[in-house]
A protein has these predicted regions:
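Feature marking well-ordered beta-strand scaffolds used for ligand recognition
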Residues: 1-461
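Secreted, short cysteine-rich peptides and small extracellular cysteine-rich domains stabilized by multiple disulfide
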Residues: 461-478
Length: 478
């Protein structure tokens, strides 16, 4: 059955601008250059930089092309994949691009290099590759300890085949050095469990998402190690367990977390209001990426968990403790949601002033008020024609959305969204299921398929015989 072409739907959100030439955008980061704001857009075609100081007139600065990124043996006509969560060193002006196993048409039985490109963006209008560091994974890479180290997550392609984080010393970005350690090991050798991504909170805790839940680590300073009972110094290559664990199956059936956010310190006001029941720093917001119903009715949802009772190592070991679920949300039965043969899962999100901007693939970008963590409410949504919303990013009271079908769109919330937040009003139709009808359109959503290595835990654009993604360009057969 073909995917329906989706009728556009939006409420309390308006389109401010678009970044030209950003179709197949995957992830975005920002950096300050004096008075200038620069956006880094990672795409299947490489890396683009834009001057977005004037949001009404964004200006392309440079394009590091996939042809420039191609390694010996690559087919440069095929796509770069995936760098799902680009990181930028704001001080040294370095960009980090994680390379997956199926980039540039690589397939078995041939060699399939994975690892990280380190790109100099000292001049954002003149991007230069400093190095490519090959290692046995390459899905996402995250700056640790002021970008002196990288934690890289993904499928472990070494003989161990355990879920783990790879640690790279990038103090010299021209000669990165992988350290002989395994961080956040998940499962036994050969089980094929994975880590997926790392987010660092405002306290410096590094949160690792993947199979069996989300766990946090100190990477600096002296702390009591709950796994040994001893006080020791935390390091990027030898972190100290902090808190976290699994999620009840009823709330997250796959037990696979995709990304997370813990509001604390300077970001505390971005998260739910602290209460006696849920004090400051005790909540963890995270995504289950899973594809069940077209409306995410029972899986692939947004989950808010309590970290209380997990600070003594309870979330580690063969049977990690499950965190208490505080709240859950999905687009099911929400205004702006379309039924039928469409792709739905929670994906990346970003938080500002208690509002979550959230990507849900074909169900678009949703805006949720999380003031009450037990009851998130939808205050606006943006589900344009052919939406395949990948990741949203708050930037100066606007939201940049990386949509792999439409490119990067810059959105603004309208007054109605803030009024709904102030009054606690959910923009849900109560008389009947608030769903939009499919109709014919001039545009068609990008087809998605399960990743040959991660399955539906991390889908990819399906093989298509066209100029953007030719037959075989998307990796192994799905």
């Amino acid at each position: 059955m073909d995917k329906p072409r989706l009728q556009a739907a939006a409420k309390n959100v308006r389109l401010k601008a678009s970044l030209p030439g950003t179709e197949r955008a995957i992830s975005i980061a920002f950096a300050q250059y004096g008075p200038r704001d620069v956006a880094f857009v990672s795409m299947e075609t490489g890396l683009k930089t834009f001057d977005v100081t004037d949001l009404d007139k964004p200006k392309l600065l440079d394009h590091l092309t996939k042809e420039e990124m191609a390694l010996p043996g690559d087919d440069p006509t095929k796509r770069f994949w995936e760098n799902e969560d680009i990181n930028v060193d704001p001080k040294r002006k370095l960009a980090f691009l994680a390379r997956e196993v199926n980039s540039f048409g690589r397939a078995l039985p041939g060699d399939r290099p994975t690892g990280n490109y380190i790109v100099s963006a000292v001049d954002p209008a003149d991007l230069k590759i400093l190095s490519f560091h090959r290692q046995n994974t390459g899905h996402t890479s995250t700056c640790i300890n002021d970008c002196q180290f990288l934690w890289t997550a993904g499928l472990d392609r070494s003989d161990a085949k355990t879920g783990r984080i790879f640690v790279t010393d990038i103090r010299d970005p021209k000669t990165p050095k992988e350290l002989p350690v395994s961080v956040d090991v998940r499962g036994k050798a050969g089980e094929g469990k994975i880590t997926h991504d790392v987010q660092v909170d405002a306290q410096g805790i590094a949160w690792v998402a993947g199979d069996d839940g989300t766990r946090g680590y100190y990477t600096q300073g002296w702390h009591r190690d709950p796994l040994s009972g001893k006080y020791r110094e935390a390091k990027a290559w030898d972190p100290v367990a902090y808190a976290g664990g699994g999620v009840p199956k009823a709330d997250m059936p796959t037990s696979f977390t995709h990304n997370s956010f813990r509001p604390i310190g300077r970001t505390l006001d971005d998260g739910p209001r602290p209460t006696r029941e849920n004090p400051a720093g005790s909540l963890l917001l995270h995504t289950e990426e899973a594809f069940g119903s077209p409306t995410c009715k029972t899986e692939g949802r947004f989950v808010i968990s309590s970290l209380q009772g997990t600070h003594n190592g309870e979330g580690w070991g063969e049977k990690p403790k499950e965190m208490k679920t505080v709240g859950i949300w999905s687009p099911d039965d929400q205004e702006g949601t379309i039924p039928g043969n469409v792709t739905c899962s929670a994906h990346y999100f970003d938080v500002q002033k208690r509002i979550v901007a959230y990507s849900w693939y074909n169900q678009g970008t949703r805006f949720l008020d999380i003031s009450n963590p037990a009851k998130p409410i939808q205050i606006g949504y943006w589900r344009p024609d052919t939406a395949t919303s990948w990741a949203p990013y708050w930037h100066r009271n606007t939201v940049f959305v990386a949509d792999i079908s439409r490119g990067v769109e810059i959105l603004e919330l309208e007054k109605g969204a803030y009024d709904a937040q102030a009054s606690g009003t959910n923009v849900t139709l109560t008389e009947h299921h608030a769903r939009e009808l499919a109709r014919e359109s001039d545009r068609e959503p990008v087809p998605l398929a399960p990743n040959p290595f991660y399955g539906w835990a991390c889908p990819m654009v399906a093989n298509r015989d066209d100029s953007d993604c030719g037959v075989g360009a998307c990796g192994a057969p799905c």
